[in-house]
UniProtKB/Swiss-Prot annotation:
Keywords: Chloroplast, mRNA processing, Plastid, RNA-binding, tRNA processing. It comes from Trifolium repens (Creeping white clover). One of its GO terms (molecular function) is RNA binding. Disulfide bonds: none annotated. GO terms for biological process: mRNA processing; RNA splicing; tRNA processing. It is found in: Plastid, Chloroplast. This is Maturase K.
Amino acid sequence: MKEYRVYLERARSRQQDFLYPLIFREYIYGLAYSHNFNRSIFMENGGYDNKYSLLNVKRLITRMYQQNHLIISANDSNKNPFLGYNKNFYSQIISEGFAIIVEIPFFLQLSSSLEEAEIIKSYKNVRSIHSIFPFLEDKFTYLNYVSDIRIPYPIHLEILIQILRYWVKDVPFFHLLRLFLSHFCNWNCFIPTKKSISTFSKRNPRLFLFLHNFYVCEYESIFLFLRNKSSHLRLKSFSVFFERIFFYAKRKHLVEVFSKDFSYTLPFFKDPNIHYVRYQGKCILASKNVPFLMNKWKYYFIHLWQCFFDVWSQPRTININQLSEHSFQLLGYFSNVRLNRSVVRSQMLQNTFLIEIVSKKLDIIVPIIPLIRSLAKAKFCNVLGHPISKPVWADSSDFDIIERFLRICRNLSHYYNGSSKKKSLYRIKYILRLSCIKTLACKHKSTVRAFLKRSGSEELLEEFFTEEEEILSLIFPRDSFSLRRFHRNRIWYLDILFSNDLVNDE
């Protein structure tokens, strides 16, 4: 945050609050490099060291200065309108610079808003994307109906630009951003296709994530207003899970705007038991009341997307299910509410009664089939889950190979240790362990059995299964710690800052 403030103040001293001159500053690309680390579980670093070298950045800025007012030739659509050539290489660097620049004012405004609201400490304490699950465990066991909603996308490019212009008053920068998106991202068509959106998100992940989050923030700000108008209660926990993009100040601004524009009470139904949770482009809406009220909320969503954002959404894509009979997928987990029945014997004087007690418990299950599919895509096993070697890693040393597999196994273990049933997680560990052994045997041109017998690597490879137990035995008292209890209980790791690949595939 301090870096953003320093760079923006430096630009303001030169160009009267304009953002577009920052695209020609070297420190912007250095900041983009420092933030651009791959956080995927299965993939390795994408080679940003070469792309963000000082020589390439200087060459990029020099060529942008040499262009004749960014004139675009209609006869050569493959040329870069900024540089004239090397489109794929330099456009990604520029997109990272755009993402950093456009985030700067929003982060600064968010910082001041958080300081005014005095919630900096509580925000820093929420370090894990698993912070959603305690909310689900507390609330969903008392609810009856759930709706699994996917926020519609793509949205037209011009609508995104117009939404941004409400909050950043820099016309030249947005002309430059519109020019960049139109020619680099193939968003010239009236409605962007899903293929073009997918290509753009892979080539320009940071800029795509910012634009998508800002669109979702705009939609959720309106939804929050509707939610507060439809309930007697004001839920303080409602805003905890929003992306940190100017939400708190925007919420205050919305209250002022709507209080002036609407002098009468909107005729919304009163539903104090509705709960909303979202991560990325997927949200869960749950309620204790009858499906009729959930249906009304569904059509509110549809009309909001169609009328305000010009995004078409079909009513049949939003299903309303009974929570005790259907599971929903969120954050790479399958979750449902399980009914636990128990019989209690009660005695009063000479009479004995049998009382059946039904309690609800939220079950969070590891999705074994999607996980195996992801491992197969990353070439750790086949589609049936049989481990295979990883020949592309055979050039590395034995220590590096084992460390890579252990890192993946550790990330998966930390992410899925909160599951109710861990047999699926142990199967994934077993696949990674055998894949590691086969990779080492392939490197040494030997069979698995001969390699293990010759090198004695069995004890070293036991780290796939024993590392978690050793760490937890240091945290918990030894007299109360047992392996059986560890296997049975759910343990949420609060240092999970990366996103699981399965979350993006939902």
